[in-house]
Protein backbone atom coordinates (compact mmCIF):
# COMPACT_ATOMS: atom_id res chain seq x y z
CA UNK A 1 0.00 0.00 0.00
CA UNK A 2 1.16 3.50 -0.78
CA UNK A 3 1.70 6.55 1.39
CA UNK A 4 -1.07 8.15 -0.64
CA UNK A 5 -3.53 5.51 0.59
CA UNK A 6 -2.59 5.98 4.25
CA UNK A 7 -2.80 9.75 3.92
CA UNK A 8 -6.25 9.37 2.38
CA UNK A 9 -7.33 7.00 5.17
CA UNK A 10 -6.09 9.43 7.81
CA UNK A 11 -7.82 12.40 6.19
CA UNK A 12 -11.08 10.48 5.75
CA UNK A 13 -11.19 9.46 9.41
CA UNK A 14 -10.50 13.00 10.60
CA UNK A 15 -13.29 14.18 8.31
CA UNK A 16 -15.62 11.65 9.95
CA UNK A 17 -14.98 13.31 13.32
CA UNK A 18 -11.96 11.60 14.85
CA UNK A 19 -9.21 13.66 16.47
CA UNK A 20 -6.32 11.27 15.85
CA UNK A 21 -5.33 8.08 14.03
CA UNK A 22 -2.35 5.87 14.83
CA UNK A 23 -0.58 2.91 13.23
CA UNK A 24 1.33 0.23 15.14
CA UNK A 25 2.79 -3.25 15.01
CA UNK A 26 1.17 -5.40 17.70
CA UNK A 27 2.95 -8.79 17.68
CA UNK A 28 3.64 -8.57 21.43
CA UNK A 29 0.05 -7.85 22.46
CA UNK A 30 -2.26 -9.58 19.99
CA UNK A 31 -3.98 -12.72 21.39
CA UNK A 32 -3.14 -16.11 19.79
CA UNK A 33 -6.48 -16.44 18.00
CA UNK A 34 -5.84 -13.13 16.20
CA UNK A 35 -2.15 -13.71 15.52
CA UNK A 36 -2.59 -13.44 11.75
CA UNK A 37 -2.97 -9.69 12.26
CA UNK A 38 0.38 -8.01 12.89
CA UNK A 39 -0.73 -4.40 12.65
CA UNK A 40 -3.38 -2.13 14.14
CA UNK A 41 -5.08 1.12 13.24
CA UNK A 42 -6.02 3.11 16.35
CA UNK A 43 -9.05 5.40 16.08
CA UNK A 44 -9.33 8.24 18.61
CA UNK A 45 -12.35 10.43 19.34
CA UNK A 46 -12.09 13.37 21.73
CA UNK A 47 -14.99 13.71 24.13
CA UNK A 48 -16.72 17.07 24.57
CA UNK A 49 -15.13 19.23 27.27
CA UNK A 50 -18.51 20.88 27.83
CA UNK A 51 -20.01 17.50 28.73
CA UNK A 52 -17.04 16.11 30.68
CA UNK A 53 -16.62 19.29 32.74
CA UNK A 54 -20.17 18.89 34.07
CA UNK A 55 -19.17 15.68 35.87
CA UNK A 56 -18.82 16.47 39.57
CA UNK A 57 -19.57 13.88 42.25
CA UNK A 58 -21.25 11.61 39.73
CA UNK A 59 -21.64 11.22 35.97
CA UNK A 60 -24.47 13.04 34.22
CA UNK A 61 -27.21 11.91 31.86
CA UNK A 62 -25.53 14.00 29.16
CA UNK A 63 -22.22 12.19 29.68
CA UNK A 64 -23.91 8.78 29.50
CA UNK A 65 -25.49 9.62 26.15
CA UNK A 66 -22.32 11.28 24.85
CA UNK A 67 -20.29 8.19 25.80
CA UNK A 68 -22.65 5.94 23.84
CA UNK A 69 -22.73 8.26 20.83
CA UNK A 70 -18.92 8.40 20.76
CA UNK A 71 -18.75 4.61 20.77
CA UNK A 72 -21.21 4.44 17.88
CA UNK A 73 -19.16 6.91 15.84
CA UNK A 74 -15.97 4.94 16.51
CA UNK A 75 -17.63 1.69 15.46
CA UNK A 76 -18.74 3.35 12.23
CA UNK A 77 -15.20 4.62 11.59
CA UNK A 78 -13.86 1.12 12.23
CA UNK A 79 -16.16 -0.23 9.51
CA UNK A 80 -15.03 2.50 7.11
CA UNK A 81 -11.40 1.59 7.84
CA UNK A 82 -12.07 -2.10 7.27
CA UNK A 83 -13.75 -1.42 3.94
CA UNK A 84 -10.95 0.85 2.73
CA UNK A 85 -8.35 -1.79 3.65
CA UNK A 86 -10.42 -4.56 2.05
CA UNK A 87 -10.55 -2.67 -1.24
CA UNK A 88 -6.75 -2.64 -1.18
CA UNK A 89 -6.67 -6.43 -0.78
CA UNK A 90 -5.98 -6.56 2.97
CA UNK A 91 -7.78 -8.46 5.70
CA UNK A 92 -9.15 -6.25 8.47
CA UNK A 93 -10.81 -7.05 11.80
CA UNK A 94 -12.77 -4.34 13.67
CA UNK A 95 -12.65 -4.24 17.48
CA UNK A 96 -15.72 -2.51 18.91
CA UNK A 97 -15.22 0.63 20.98
CA UNK A 98 -16.97 -0.89 24.00
CA UNK A 99 -17.62 -4.61 24.18
CA UNK A 100 -16.69 -6.91 27.04
CA UNK A 101 -16.23 -10.62 26.41
CA UNK A 102 -16.54 -13.35 29.00
CA UNK A 103 -14.50 -16.15 27.42
CA UNK A 104 -10.99 -14.81 28.03
CA UNK A 105 -10.79 -15.25 31.79
CA UNK A 106 -11.68 -11.63 32.56
CA UNK A 107 -15.23 -10.32 32.22
CA UNK A 108 -13.96 -6.75 32.18
CA UNK A 109 -11.83 -7.06 29.07
CA UNK A 110 -12.45 -6.91 25.33
CA UNK A 111 -11.37 -8.99 22.37
CA UNK A 112 -8.27 -6.80 22.15
CA UNK A 113 -7.14 -3.91 24.35
CA UNK A 114 -7.44 -0.62 22.45
CA UNK A 115 -4.92 1.08 24.70
CA UNK A 116 -2.23 -1.49 23.87
CA UNK A 117 -2.32 -0.47 20.20
CA UNK A 118 -2.65 3.23 21.06
CA UNK A 119 0.47 3.11 23.25
CA UNK A 120 2.36 1.13 20.60
CA UNK A 121 1.44 3.84 18.10
CA UNK A 122 3.10 6.46 20.32
CA UNK A 123 -0.15 8.35 20.92
CA UNK A 124 0.07 8.31 24.72
CA UNK A 125 0.47 6.12 27.79
CA UNK A 126 -1.54 4.09 30.29
CA UNK A 127 -2.33 6.16 33.36
CA UNK A 128 -2.64 5.21 37.02
CA UNK A 129 -6.38 4.99 36.38
CA UNK A 130 -5.71 2.29 33.74
CA UNK A 131 -7.19 4.69 31.19
CA UNK A 132 -5.31 5.54 28.02
CA UNK A 133 -3.90 9.06 28.36
CA UNK A 134 -3.37 10.82 25.04
CA UNK A 135 -0.42 13.20 24.99
CA UNK A 136 -2.63 15.87 23.43
CA UNK A 137 -6.11 15.09 24.74
CA UNK A 138 -5.45 13.33 28.04
CA UNK A 139 -7.91 10.60 29.03
CA UNK A 140 -10.84 12.53 27.51
CA UNK A 141 -10.96 10.18 24.55
CA UNK A 142 -12.68 7.02 23.38
CA UNK A 143 -10.88 4.43 21.26
CA UNK A 144 -11.56 1.75 18.70
CA UNK A 145 -9.11 -0.50 16.85
CA UNK A 146 -8.87 -2.23 13.50
CA UNK A 147 -6.48 -5.16 13.24
CA UNK A 148 -5.04 -5.90 9.81
CA UNK A 149 -2.50 -7.97 7.90
CA UNK A 150 -1.60 -4.93 5.80
CA UNK A 151 1.85 -3.53 6.53
CA UNK A 152 1.26 -0.15 8.13
CA UNK A 153 3.69 2.80 8.37
CA UNK A 154 4.90 2.36 11.96
CA UNK A 155 7.76 4.30 13.45
CA UNK A 156 6.75 5.62 16.85
CA UNK A 157 8.07 4.14 20.09
CA UNK A 158 5.72 3.05 22.91
CA UNK A 159 5.46 5.63 25.67
CA UNK A 160 6.10 5.04 29.35
CA UNK A 161 3.86 6.58 32.00
CA UNK A 162 4.14 10.33 32.52
CA UNK A 163 1.82 10.42 35.53
CA UNK A 164 4.71 10.84 37.95
CA UNK A 165 3.62 11.81 41.47
CA UNK A 166 0.16 13.01 40.42
CA UNK A 167 -2.62 11.23 42.33
CA UNK A 168 -5.68 13.29 41.41
CA UNK A 169 -7.45 10.30 39.87
CA UNK A 170 -6.65 8.16 42.92
CA UNK A 171 -8.26 10.74 45.22
CA UNK A 172 -11.26 11.25 42.93
CA UNK A 173 -12.17 7.57 42.56
CA UNK A 174 -15.24 6.94 44.76
CA UNK A 175 -14.67 3.18 44.80
CA UNK A 176 -10.98 3.15 45.73
CA UNK A 177 -10.26 1.07 42.63
CA UNK A 178 -7.18 3.05 41.54
CA UNK A 179 -4.14 1.80 43.46
CA UNK A 180 -1.83 4.75 42.77
CA UNK A 181 0.94 2.94 40.92
CA UNK A 182 2.57 4.09 37.70
CA UNK A 183 2.04 1.58 34.91
CA UNK A 184 5.11 -0.15 33.52
CA UNK A 185 4.92 -2.21 30.33
CA UNK A 186 4.31 -5.85 31.15
CA UNK A 187 2.22 -5.15 34.25
CA UNK A 188 -1.16 -6.78 34.64
CA UNK A 189 -4.04 -4.33 34.93
CA UNK A 190 -4.85 -5.72 38.38
CA UNK A 191 -1.53 -4.34 39.64
CA UNK A 192 -2.74 -0.77 39.19
CA UNK A 193 -6.53 -0.99 39.06
CA UNK A 194 -9.33 -3.12 40.54
CA UNK A 195 -11.85 -3.47 37.69
CA UNK A 196 -14.29 -5.49 39.79
CA UNK A 197 -14.44 -2.81 42.49
CA UNK A 198 -14.93 -0.07 39.90
CA UNK A 199 -17.71 -1.93 38.09
CA UNK A 200 -19.52 -2.84 41.28
CA UNK A 201 -19.57 0.76 42.50
CA UNK A 202 -20.74 2.12 39.13
CA UNK A 203 -23.66 -0.28 39.03
CA UNK A 204 -24.68 0.45 42.61
CA UNK A 205 -24.20 4.21 42.60
CA UNK A 206 -24.81 5.26 39.01
CA UNK A 207 -26.94 2.49 37.51
CA UNK A 208 -29.99 4.77 37.47
CA UNK A 209 -28.40 6.91 34.73
CA UNK A 210 -28.88 4.29 32.03
CA UNK A 211 -28.30 0.76 30.86
CA UNK A 212 -24.56 0.13 31.10
CA UNK A 213 -23.10 2.19 33.94
CA UNK A 214 -20.48 4.89 33.42
CA UNK A 215 -18.51 7.08 35.84
CA UNK A 216 -15.83 9.39 34.42
CA UNK A 217 -14.62 11.03 37.64
CA UNK A 218 -11.00 9.93 37.17
CA UNK A 219 -11.06 11.15 33.58
CA UNK A 220 -12.54 14.53 34.51
CA UNK A 221 -9.87 15.42 37.11
CA UNK A 222 -6.82 14.46 35.03
CA UNK A 223 -4.87 17.65 34.20
CA UNK A 224 -3.56 16.26 30.90
CA UNK A 225 -5.54 17.46 27.91
CA UNK A 226 -7.82 19.86 29.77
CA UNK A 227 -9.08 22.74 27.66
CA UNK A 228 -7.64 26.08 28.66
Predicted regions and their residues:
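Non-catalytic, usually N-terminal nucleic-acid engagement modules in DNA/RNA processing proteins
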Residues: 1-76
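Catalytic cores of enzyme domains
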Residues: 70-228
Amino acid sequence: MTDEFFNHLHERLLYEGLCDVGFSRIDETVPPDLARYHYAVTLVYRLSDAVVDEIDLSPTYAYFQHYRAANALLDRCALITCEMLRREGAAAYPIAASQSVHDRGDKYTGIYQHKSAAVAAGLGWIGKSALFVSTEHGPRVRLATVLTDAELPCGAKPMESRCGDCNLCVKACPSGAILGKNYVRGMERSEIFDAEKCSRHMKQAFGHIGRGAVCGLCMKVCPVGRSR
